[in-house]
C-alpha cells in the first residue's frame, strides 16, 4: 500500500466520497483533517506475513480496479498465496480463490461498477466449494 503516501486530500475533491462528506458532515470544512487522520490510520495497518495469507482456507474473491491504489502485481501475489493462478484445466479444476481486475476502475470508482460486481459476486457465492 505504498501508494498511500502519495495521496493528498485535494486528490479526493469532487469524488463521491468528498461530495457525500461535505453534504452530511457537521463541519464539512474539516475534510482535510479527516483525510489526514485516515491516512495516518492506514499507515498503521500491518502487513500480513505470506504464511498467514496462505493459511486462509476459505474461498476468497479479490477485486481491484486496474487503476487501483492496490497494484495489480500485489493482487496477483495475494491470489497466488490463496491458491490461485494455477492451471485450471486439469482434473483438480479451478481453485476456490478468484481474482477480478476491473478495467477502467479505481479503488473509489469500483462502487460505480455494480453491474459487474453483482454478477461476479453472485457467481462466486454460488460456486461449489472444492475440498482441499
Labelled PLM ranges:
Residues 16-37:
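Short glycine/proline- and acidic residue-enriched helix-loop micro-motifs
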Residues 1-21:
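Flexible "cap/lid" loop of the alpha/beta hydrolase fold
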Residues 66-69, 104-106:
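Acidic beta-to-alpha connecting loop that harbors the catalytic carboxylate
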Residues 36-52:
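Active-site nucleophile elbow and catalytic-triad environment of alpha/beta-hydrolase enzymes
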Residues 53-57, 92-94:
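Short, conserved loop/helix-junction motifs that constitute active-site signature segments
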Residues 56, 62-64:
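Short beta-strand/loop motif that positions the catalytic acidic residue
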Residues 89-132:
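Catalytic active-site module of serine/aspartate enzymes centered on a nucleophile-bearing elbow/loop
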Residues 69-77, 110:
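Conserved alpha/beta-hydrolase "acid-adjacent" motif
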